[in-house]
UniProtKB/Swiss-Prot annotation:
The keyword Disulfide bond applies. InterPro entries: Cystine-knot_cytokine (IPR029034), Noggin (IPR008717). The gene is nog. This is Noggin. SUPFAM superfamilies: Cystine-knot cytokines. It comes from the Eukaryota. It comes from Takifugu rubripes (Japanese pufferfish).
Length: 223
């Protein structure tokens, strides 16, 4: 192995050992602790599946429903089946391809000390080597947010919601053990078709409800 590659490999080895000692608290129980879901779906509603409880064509006037809904954000809501996002469901992003998602270098990566002596030597890494190590760490630990359109069915309006999910097929930490998990979320207002049996018969109406969606992902311990 030529000297530059050997130097990079040595720094990565020492960095891995340091991170293991620093973040080992969550590591031993990685395979023993339950892993939470990275999605935030609507709580399953117990409803009669009969078509009599479905909205009729006269109940789907788009102008009236938009008036009831108020804020209609077409980036996340759609009445008709939309085209899928290019990165939807992609759980196998290449390490350095993650940089294409953009953004500033995280402060946690900038704060990593690469000047610690390696194996008793006094050599310090060059600025170029530091930058390469920072980029490698960023690409490896980066947790992009993937979007995909979800069809909620005819009893929700608009029935298509663009929901976020965290790519978690591989570990995002050095050493392995941490995965990408939801960090923040928000709520979209949509309408739900609700029918209630009254003495005078079936009473149905569109009612507003909050639909939770993930807005950011972060590399963190499981559990």
């Amino acid at each position: 192995m030529d000297p530059p590659r050997l130097r990079v490999a040595t720094y990565l080895l020492l960095l891995s050992v340091g991170l293991l000692l620093h973040g080992g608290a969550c590591q031993p129980y990685y395979l023993l602790r339950p892993i939470p879901s990275d999605s935030l779906p609507i709580v399953e509603l117990k409803e009669d599946p009969g078509p009599v409880f479905d909205p009729k064509e006269r109940d789907l006037n788009e102008t009236e429903l938009k008036s009831v809904l108020g804020d209609f954000d077409s980036r996340f809501l759609s009445v008709l089946p939309p085209a899928e996002d290019g990165h939807a469901g992609n759980d196998e992003l290449d390490d350095f391809d993650a940089q294409r998602w953009g953004g500033a270098l995280p402060k946690e990566i900038r704060a990593v000390d690469f000047d610690a002596p390696q194996l008793g030597k006094k050599h310090k890494p060059s600025k170029k080597l530091k930058r390469r190590l920072q980029q490698w760490l960023w690409a490896y630990s980066f947790c992009p947010l993937a979007h995909a359109w979800t069809d909620l069915g005819s009893r929700f309006w608009p029935r298509f919601v663009r929901a976020g999910s965290c790519l978690s097929k591989r570990s995002c930490s050095v050493p392995e053990g941490m995965t990408c998990k939801p960090a923040t979320s928000t709520h979209l207002t949509i309408l739900r078709w609700r029918c209630v049996q009254r003495k005078v018969g079936l009473k149905c109406a569109w009612i507003p409800m909050q639909y939770p969606v993930i807005t950011d992902c972060k590399c963190s311990c499981s559990g």
